[in-house]
């Protein structure tokens, strides 16, 4: 794609209204932070929030203007999210689903919100979702992007 066409595409993406009211990224490592950066750069959400157990990543992302809000506690920022991106290790997904289910039960989230995971294997994710929600949620989109190089974490995002 020529530079001129790319600039037109970028310009048109930035002038369209956001697709989402609020996106919540759970996990600000390489993949989660890369998704957050792409969402921010392309104006895809009116509000972008994140959860990460590593508080300095949240603080830095807010200071850099990447996030509108963030916390180590999912319940602090998830309310009203219409897209949730789960970017945590596979073994942590069950606990994330517990928190998401609690937010749905408390009325903080719509039961049909879109959820996607960017974890590696899918069998454990699907089994955990079925166990937590009783069946596979219609808004769950299992995925796994190819990302990265020799670096990891928030600073490795592009």
Task: Identify the meaning behind each predicted range.
Residues 2-79:
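NAD(P)+-binding Rossmann beta1-loop-alpha1 motif at the extreme N-terminus of oxidoreductases
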Residues 74-114:
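Rossmann-like NAD(P)-binding element
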Residues 53, 69, 92, 150-151:
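Short secondary-structure boundary/capping elements
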Residues 155-158:
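Ligand/cofactor pocket segment of small-molecule handling proteins
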Residues 53-54, 88, 118:
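Short beta->alpha hinge that forms the Motif I/post-I loop of the SAM-binding pocket
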Residues 99-152:
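Rossmann-like NAD(P)(H) cofactor-binding subdomain of soluble oxidoreductases
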Residues 57, 92, 122-125:
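Conserved short alpha-helix immediately C-terminal to the canonical SAM/SAH-binding motif I
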């Amino acid at each position: 794609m020529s530079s001129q066409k790319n600039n037109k595409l970028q310009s048109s993406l930035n002038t369209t209204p956001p697709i989402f009211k609020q996106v919540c990224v759970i996990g600000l490592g390489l993949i989660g932070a890369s998704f957050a950066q792409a969402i921010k750069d392309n104006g895809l959400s009116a509000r972008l929030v994140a959860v990460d157990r590593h508080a300095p990543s949240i603080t830095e992302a807010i200071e850099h203007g990447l996030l509108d809000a963030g916390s180590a506690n999912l319940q602090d920022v998830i309310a009203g999210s219409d897209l949730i991106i789960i970017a945590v290790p596979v073994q942590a997904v069950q606990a994330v689903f517990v928190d998401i289910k609690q937010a749905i039960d408390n009325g903080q989230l719509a039961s049909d919100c879109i959820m996607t995971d960017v974890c590696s294997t899918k069998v454990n994710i699907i089994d955990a979702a079925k166990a937590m929600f009783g069946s596979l949620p219609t808004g769950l989109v299992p995925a796994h992007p190819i990302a990265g190089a020799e670096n990891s974490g928030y600073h490795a995002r592009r």
